[in-house]
Regions:
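Right-handed beta-helix
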Residues: 1-125
Length: 125
């Protein structure tokens, strides 16, 4: 168009591409079985046969007025090269079989109020 908006159709590969002058784009591809949403800041969301990829060179924020639920049939994994922080009114962790918490350098369990450690057999050291 006059303002450099592009809408491209590839009938052979069955791909529709929408590109703005600022290089924001949406690509719908039957050939690659994917949908790509990408902005000029290199943030992108890709849906393909492997799943959904959300990628950003900066922060990603998820916010809700209600609750946020993450559910998986397989594992849920989180890793960070810096700290991982959880904060809430109460934090509850429960394992159906085994629970392990380990600090390679240090570990601390503390409370300003009562601290309870329970188990069939409690071993310290």
């Amino acid at each position: 168009t006059r303002s450099k908006l592009k809408l491209e159709f590839d009938d052979e590969k069955k791909i529709i591409t929408l590109i703005t002058p600022g290089n924001n784009k949406i690509v719908i591809s039957d050939d690659q079985k994917s949908i790509l949403l990408q902005d000029q800041n290199s943030n992108k969301i890709e849906l393909n046969s492997s799943g959904i990829i959300i990628d950003s060179p900066k922060d990603i924020k998820i916010s809700a007025k209600g609750k946020v639920t993450i559910d998986a049939v397989g594992n849920i994994e989180s890793t960070a090269q810096a700290d991982i922080k959880n904060q809430g009114l109460n934090i509850n962790h429960q394992a159906n079989i085994g629970f392990s918490a380990k600090g390679n350098a240090t570990a601390e369990l503390s409370a300003s109020g009562q601290t309870t450690v329970k188990g069939g057999i409690v071993m310290i050291n």
